[in-house]
Structure formats: structure tokens, C-alpha cells
Amino acid sequence: FLSCSGKSGLESGIPKVSLVIDGTFDDKSFNESALNGVKKLKEEFEIELVLKESSTNSYLSDLEGLKDAGSNLIWLIGYKFSDVAKAVSLQNSEMKYAIIDPVYSNEPIPANLVGMTFRAQEGAFLTGYIAAKVSKTGKIGFLGGIEGDIVDAFRYGYEAGAKYANKDIKIFSQYIGSFSDLEAGRSVATKMYSDGIDIIHHAAGLGGIGAIEVAKELGSGHYIIGVDEDQSYLAPNNVITSTTKDVGRSLNLLTSNYLKTNTFEGGKLINYGLKEGVVGFVRNPKMIPFEVEKEIDSLSSKIINKEVIVPYNKESYEKFLKEFI
């Protein structure tokens, strides 16, 4: 039970850690990264792991079920859980909750809830820079899932990095309104490639997997940038790099500390970026010229030292263009 010290009920029995996602675990990016993070915990700790694929209409009932089944810590993966995470935390003060990518403004966060946010724009800035340097057509694309704070960070970071590399680069960005529509991803990617775009950065879940499939089918000259994890294994000749957001590592760090110390640092948001080694890009000497990788290393240092402030939305992007381009 929650006490003033933040101690939690790990004193008796095998701890039970639950992982709740919206969608499926085999999305080859975001949810799968979270799953890999908790699986690594089982190598180090004796825990019971509960995995739950949920959907909007069943969030509350699923979370009640996990609470009643004795979960010590419940992880909620993705911004769609933002509202329900606060609601259940307030209702069940003895429980521990953690959420990845919550969308909270300056509102207070319950003491038994911790949120993890990411400066994904910093990694996307680097891959945008790469795209602009590597593109042969001078036209690159961005394929997003659902428009909003989380995907916008990827989009505007990517666009800013591309413009930083080449102010004349042409960028075409489009959202498909879903993270689970493979066919929509295929359709938009096909159109982009036919319009002369030769590199697409996706942040569209299964839609992005569809885009990778299209790049692979079209072959040489059709390239893609993966997201969250290294996705090069899906199309080794077409995936130039991936903008990484190590959800699994961040989840693992917090849960390990909780299991080792029996303390829970709730009531706040933890923010990770390039500096913490949680976001970044995948090196690929086969497709990224050595001199470009050297430029990226220098650029990373500038971002970490705040010499370059990477935009994360439309407003900050427009400000960035005035300052740096």
C-alpha cells in the first residue's frame, strides 16, 4: 500500500507487473519495444508478467480486472490512456501506474502515477538531416498515423533536420488517421513514391509497416526511415535508418528501480531525449556516407548542448525556420 515514503506492496509474494496496450503487441515498433522491455525484467527478477491487448471501450474494465487480479504495477502504453490513467490512479490510491507518452499539460499528476515522455523530435531531426543529405530527387516525405502531440514531434523534428541540411529540400507530410491501417500506409507510400519522393519517414504503426512493404516491392531507389526500433530487418535494402525511441529501455529502468528498492517516484513526468541515450538513430554505414555520420555526431552534440533547439510542433517549427534557416 502507498505510504509517505512511496513504498509499495512488494513485501509478500511474487510481484505482478502488467502491461496494457491499445492494439497488438506484434506491431514491430512501439508496442513491441515495450514488450521487449518487460521481458528483459523476467531475466533479472522473479516476477509474474501479465500482458493485455485492450481497446478504448474496454480500458476501464481491463484495468479493474488487472487491479482485482493483484497487479503491483500497471504500465499503460500510449497517449490514448492519458485520461483513464489519471482516473484509475485517483480511484485506486494503493495501486501503482505508469504511462508512456501521456498528453498532460500543467495539470497535477497523482502520487501513484508516473508518466514517461520523450523528445522524439531530437532523433527525428537527425534522420531528417540524413534524408536530405541522401535524397537523390530532392523530395522527401513523412507518413504519420494520428495527428497530435506525439506524432507531430516526429514530423516537425524530421522536417527541421531536413531543412537544416538543405534549405531547398521539398518535404511532403501526410497523416492517415490511424496506427492500425496497413492498407492506408501502402496507398499513401505508393502515391508518394510515384510523385518522385525517394525517402519516407513513417510514424504510423501498422500503416508504416505497409509503407516499408511498398518500398521493398518497388526496390532500388525507394527508401524509408523506420520508427521506435531498428526496422531495417523488414527491408534491409530500403530502410536507411530508424528514428529510435527506446520505450522498452525506459520502461525497464523505472520498473527495475521499483522492484529493487520498493520505492515509486510518482506524481511527475520523466522526460527522455538524446542526452539520456533513449532517443536517437540507427547507424547504417551501408547507406549513410561516413561524412554524413560525422556531421550527425557533431549535430547530436549541438542538440545536447542546446546550441540547436529542435522544434516539436508547428509553432516551434516556424520559429526554428526563422532562427536557423
UniProtKB/Swiss-Prot annotation:
GO CC term, one of those recorded: plasma membrane
Bilayer disposition of the protein: Lipid-anchor
UniProt entry keywords in alphabetical sequence: Cell inner membrane, Cell membrane, Lipoprotein, Membrane, Palmitate, Signal, Transport
Record InterPro entries: BMP_lipoprotein, Peripla_BP_I, PnrA-like
Covalently attached lipid (N-palmitoyl cysteine), positions: 4
Domain of life assignment: Bacteria
Subcellular location: Cell inner membrane
Family assignment from sequence similarity: Belongs to the BMP lipoprotein family.
Name of the protein: Basic membrane protein A
Effect of residue 254 to F: In strain: PLe
Lipid attachment site numbers (S-diacylglycerol cysteine): 4
Pfam hit, one: Bmp
CDD domains cross-referenced by the UniProt entry: PBP1_PrnA-like
Complexes and interactors: Monomer.
Effect caused by changing residue 240 to V: In strain: PLj7
Gene name of the encoded protein: bmpA
Signal peptide: 1-3
Purpose: Immunogenic protein. May be part of an ABC-type nucleoside uptake system involved in the purine salvage pathway.
Species whose genome carries this gene: Borreliella afzelii (Borrelia afzelii)
SUPFAM superfamilies: Periplasmic binding protein-like I
